Curated annotation (Swiss-Prot):
Protein's UniProt keywords contain Cell inner membrane: yes
Family, similarity comment: Belongs to the ATPase A chain family.
Recorded topology in the membrane: Multi-pass membrane protein
Keyword Transferase in record: no
Name listed for the protein in its UniProt record: ATP synthase subunit a
Superkingdom, natural source: Bacteria
Protein location: Cell inner membrane
Matching Pfam families: ATP-synt_A (PF00119)
Function: Key component of the proton channel; it plays a direct role in the translocation of protons across the membrane.
GO MF annotation, one: proton-transporting ATP synthase activity, rotational mechanism
């Protein structure tokens, strides 16, 4: 049902594909993930293809994003963190573009799918673990041993640190998924109120004013949330990468 606020999150097959009994179908989620990546890459290519000393609008926006992520990385993970700039910048642009695409009517919000946000979170944590062991070997395990902890408290603190580390991909994925899901459901509910009351004619139009105002206000808020969630995802990624670069430095 179109009135169902959760209907917008249903994954639907566009091109059914099954190989060896495994479903590889191209879905609306696949389409908008590809579109998000293509739009982000296309914008950056267009913005930087004709670079000038006096930047145009698109180049200015691209430079703002570049400096924004570069500053975030150096502050969160030090100068060595810049080696991860392509990863963090790509994640930020993908999440931001996917969030913004989901704001358009009849478009699909891929970041409202826990499987998508979980895959992004696993990519981040996997990078942290692989790089940590590659760079530091078993000294990477110092990330679970904060400096200055009394020996008597060490077993308890190490246990807490391990649990905290293992919960990172969960919190990173659920935070993005839950915020996008809740925001879009709320928008759908208020928009449904407007449509239902407006269908009652002159009597319902007056009652639809308040839900309409709320819908407009929530739409503006959701655009802000779309950026903030991409920002938070990038910030946390930088913090986690710092543990791989400087284990035991917290």
């Amino acid at each position: 049902m179109s009135s169902d606020p959760t209907h917008q999150f249903l994954i639907q097959k566009i091109v059914p594909i099954e190989i060896g009994g495994i479903d590889f179908s191209f879905t609306n989620a696949s389409l908008f993930m590809a579109a998000s990546a293509a739009i982000a890459a296309g914008f950056l290519y267009f913005a930087t293809s004709n670079r000038a000393i006096v930047p145009g609008r698109s180049q200015s926006v691209a430079e703002i994003f570049y400096e924004f992520i570069a500053k975030m990385l150096t502050e969160g993970a030090g100068k060595q963190g810049m080696q991860f700039f392509p990863l963090v910048f790509s994640l930020f642009m993908f999440v931001l573009t996917a969030n913004l695409l989901g704001m358009f009517p009849y478009f699909f919000t891929v970041t409202s799918q826990i499987i998508v946000t979980a895959a992004l979170a696993i990519l981040v944590i996997g990078t942290v673990v692989v790089y940590g062991f590659y760079k530091h070997g078993f000294k990477f395990l110092n990330v679970f041993v904060p400096s200055g902890v009394p020996g008597i408290l060490l077993p308890l603190v190490v246990t807490i640190e391990i649990i905290s580390f293992l919960s990172r991909p969960i919190s990173l994925s659920v935070r993005l998924f839950a915020n996008m899901l809740a925001g879009h459901i709320t928008l759908k509910v208020f928009a449904g109120f407007v449509a239902s009351l407006g269908a009652l004619g002159a009597v319902g139009v007056g009652g639809a004013v308040l839900p309409l105002i709320m819908t407009v206000a929530l739409t503006g808020l959701e655009f802000l949330v779309a950026f903030l969630q991409a920002y938070v995802f990038a910030v946390l990624t930088c913090m986690y990468l710092n543990d791989a670069i400087h284990p035991g430095g917290h």
